[in-house]
């Protein structure tokens, strides 16, 4: 198994609930290491650029509005099968359909305010990690 990196964002709803530490504990318990992390308040332009793949979708404006509504915690996670492992930890996009014990089942309020974002594939992860952590500020351990 290869070591991968993936991007995770703890969204404004979960940051406001003060559950960052509980979510980090789940990453670490699953064998994922936090290789880089920072808290930021996205600008509209940053959110639109990051979610540009969804630009033509009907939910794009609401997604951008939500993502700029408060600070987010962004982290690059590293470990074996990091992309899949993080997606399993997150659970289904709709928290009502998320398996019990997943991050979204435990901390999300709705399909929009669903606590976390995670890269959906290794290729996407590379682009997303580079978006938030350009250069050499990621540290393998």
Curated annotation (Swiss-Prot):
Annotated signal sequence range: none
Main EC class the enzyme belongs to: transferase
GO cellular component term of the entry, any: cytoplasm
One Pfam family it belongs to: NDK
Enzyme Commission number: 2.7.4.6
Record's subcellular location: Cytoplasm
Active-site residues, record numbering mapped to chain: 117 (pros-phosphohistidine intermediate)
Subunit structure: Homotetramer.
Official protein name in the record: Nucleoside diphosphate kinase
